[in-house]
């Protein structure tokens, strides 16, 4: 059984962008582009999970490359899926909120002098 690399584009992108990444992987990996239709996070959740559920039985391991809003939707939707590695390119996230919740920096960091 092969391994899969799934590319998820950003808004206005296309699954065809996955072709760029083929040169980075040997024949043990099938590079797939996921052309999702969702525009809102709660729509993406179901669509992304269903797509990955259809892939999981067919591959030994799945790697993920996701861009922009596709990366954001992936983080929200796929945290429980068996993805071996993920590369997020320019994900749209609320970094201030993330930093505050993991408590690595004091809230004073965000205040004006």
Residue spans of the language-model regions?
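The alpha/beta-hydrolase serine catalytic core
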Residues: 83-113
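Short glycine-/acidic-enriched loop or helix-start segments at secondary-structure transitions
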Residues: 16-18, 73-76, 97-98
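Short, glycine/serine-rich, charged loops/turns that create anion-binding
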Residues: 11-12, 69, 93
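Short coil/turn segments at beta-strand junctions that form active-site/ligand-binding loops
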Residues: 2-3, 59-62, 84
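Aromatic pocket-lining residues of Rossmann-like dinucleotide-binding sites
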Residues: 77-81
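Short, surface-exposed "cap/lid" segments of acyl-processing enzymes
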Residues: 1-39
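Gly/Ala-rich beta-loop-alpha elbow adjacent to hydrolase catalytic centers
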Residues: 65-74
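Alpha/beta-hydrolase active-site loop
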Residues: 17, 38-57
């Amino acid at each position: 059984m092969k391994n899969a690399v799934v590319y998820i584009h950003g808004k206005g992108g296309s699954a065809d962008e996955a072709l760029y990444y083929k040169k980075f992987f040997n024949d043990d990996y099938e590079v797939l582009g996921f052309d999702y239709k969702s525009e809102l996070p709660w729509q993406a959740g179901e669509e992304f999970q269903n797509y990955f559920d259809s892939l999981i039985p067919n591959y030994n391991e799945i790697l993920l490359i996701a861009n922009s809003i596709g990366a954001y939707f992936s983080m929200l939707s796929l945290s429980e899926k068996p993805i071996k590695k993920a590369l997020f390119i320019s994900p749209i996230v609320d970094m201030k909120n993330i930093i505050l919740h993991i408590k690595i920096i004091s809230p004073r960091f965000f205040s004006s002098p």
